[in-house]
């Protein structure tokens, strides 16, 4: 490939240049199909353990039989030392390309031949063998149903999500309705903000919540969504002005910060105990 590229720089004949370019592209296609590293060293083994409360996940570089032995050892240890029973139904051995559920996420390893140019313009397979965190669609659906913000109807054999008014909020002030929706949207987004598909699914979550909020306020004021949006719209935002208990004029703005994916904070010192020592006042 390098020889052909060098020859291409000095070649002036149009037909020869075209043939050289076709050959170079062919070499690039072959290179993109070849693994850049050894896929599996048969003698290499590794185990990674992650726990939160009573949920844990173990990643193993090894065979299925070895994973079975590890599971059996953990089951015996928990029974003998901790006096706990390991649920056989929930404790599964999952191949890396399949989806494993952990703390509300689905975790998998991407198998992709897709390419992307790096900052130097070099075409690379950046997505293959990467661990991916996914927000499950069912989690979004169930959360919206739990909030009573959505109803599901069947259209031509497919699910259709429709926002609806939250009737139990009819006694709340409009600004309090907006505040409640904002709190729920931020809470859901912040928890799943490191998921690879958070932008797509949280946009849908946000849309349903937004129109549920419109419908809730419209129902409270015996109005329509169109009239409510027109009444409270201000510079592309939904803003409710109100007077607080102290007589001060304030505004409540509906969530408008988007659903961009955030980077995981791998260096967060969440396990370090706080220093509670203090010096007495002199």
Each model region followed by its residue ranges:
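Non-catalytic terminal/accessory segments
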Residues: 1-282
């Amino acid at each position: 490939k390098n020889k052909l590229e060098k020859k291409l720089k000095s070649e002036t004949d149009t037909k020869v240049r075209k043939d050289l370019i076709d050959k170079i592209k062919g070499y690039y296609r072959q290179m993109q199909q070849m693994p850049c590293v050894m896929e599996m060293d048969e003698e290499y083994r590794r185990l990674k353990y992650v726990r939160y409360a009573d949920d844990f996940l173990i990643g193993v570089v090894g065979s299925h039989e070895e994973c079975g032995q590890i599971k059996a050892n953990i089951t015996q240890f928990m029974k003998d030392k901790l006096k706990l029973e390991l649920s056989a139904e929930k404790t599964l051995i999952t191949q890396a390309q399949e989806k494993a559920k952990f703390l509300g996420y689905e975790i998998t390893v991407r198998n992709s031949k897709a390419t992307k140019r790096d900052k130097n313009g070099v075409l690379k397979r950046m997505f293959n063998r990467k661990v991916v965190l996914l927000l499950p669609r069912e989690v979004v659906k169930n959360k919206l149903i739990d909030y009573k913000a959505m109803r599901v109807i069947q259209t031509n054999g497919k699910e259709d999500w429709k926002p609806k008014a939250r009737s139990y909020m009819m006694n709340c002030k409009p600004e309090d309705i907006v505040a409640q929706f904002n709190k729920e949207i931020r809470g859901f987004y912040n928890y799943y903000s490191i998921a690879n598909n958070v932008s797509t699914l949280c946009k849908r979550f946000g849309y349903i919540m937004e129109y549920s909020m419109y419908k809730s306020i419209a129902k409270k004021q015996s109005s329509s969504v169109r009239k409510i949006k027109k009444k409270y719209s201000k510079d592309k935002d939904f803003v409710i002005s109100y007077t607080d208990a102290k007589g001060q004029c304030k505004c409540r703005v509906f969530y408008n910060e988007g659903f961009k994916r955030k980077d995981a904070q791998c260096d967060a010192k969440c396990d370090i105990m706080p220093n509670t020592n203090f010096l007495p006042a002199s």
